[in-house]
Amino acid sequence: MAKHLYKTPIPSTRKGTLDRQVKSNPRNNLIHGRHRCGKGRNSRGIITASIEGEVIKRLYRKIDFRRNQKDISGRIVTIESDPNRNAYICLIHYGDGEKRYILHPRGAIIGDTIVSGTKVPISMGNALPLTDMPLGTVMHNKENTRGRGGQLARAAGAVAKHKAKEGKMATLRLPSGEGRIVTQNSLATVGQEGKVGVNQKSLGRAGSKCWLGKRPVVRGVVMNPVDHPHGGGEGKAPIGRKKPTTPWGYPALGRRTRKRKKYSDSFILRRRK
């Protein structure tokens, strides 16, 4: 990720960074409108997430997560930024005239050729099933089930590693450190996801964060008792409870939110860190 520092005497943007490497100029047939109606409220208008707000107006880019253009070579024409995700996207022109967006593999440049299918070369950006990948291969945009499209390792800089094979199943190490079993006939894209180091970007000011739908975070201990269970007291007072809670009294800071009996529990060999 190429970062550009603001050169300004204004305190709000003095330490902010911009990504000057790519710009977005999407094709009209690969975008559509997207209505965001949440804004941290439920159907009755009651606040359910106090740190979520309205995001800046944007258009959704149709991303090809399935990579189902089998054995047809495609050429990378542009590398663009996507306001709906923290990773770059690439515009691909296939040999049959099809044009699609895919996630940008790290190191791919304009003019490179990619292909998806079985028995294709194991090179950066190619999509193929795990049966054709040797152990130790790094990948991103991994499918859970054949034909459903990539669901794992899709964030900027994400990478999963092929650890083992047994029968029709394979073992992967995900970016979170979790060990998961997946089917070998499912597709994955070779290489690491691009835009590494996006977590080191400094927004510089609160307005840039509000564009992303993130509102200011206020501690409960500085609120009134009517607004939060931690509120009230004289001066800097403790929360008055054994454990911290949410504004609605539920346990916070460490409570597991995953369903106890989820169908995919049997596919997890090692929990994430």
UniProtKB/Swiss-Prot annotation:
Name a biological process GO annotation. mitochondrial translation
| Gene3D superfamilies assigned | 2.30.30.30, Nucleic acid-binding proteins (2.40.50.140), Ribosomal protein L2, domain 3 (4.10.950.10)
Disordered as annotated region, ranges: 1-25, 225-253
Report the domain of life of the source organism: Eukaryota
Q: What is this protein called?
A: Large ribosomal subunit protein uL2cz/uL2cy
Q: Where in the cell is it found?
A: Plastid, Chloroplast
Give the family per the record. Answer: Belongs to the universal ribosomal protein uL2 family.
Where this protein primarily resides, as one coarse class? Answer: plastid
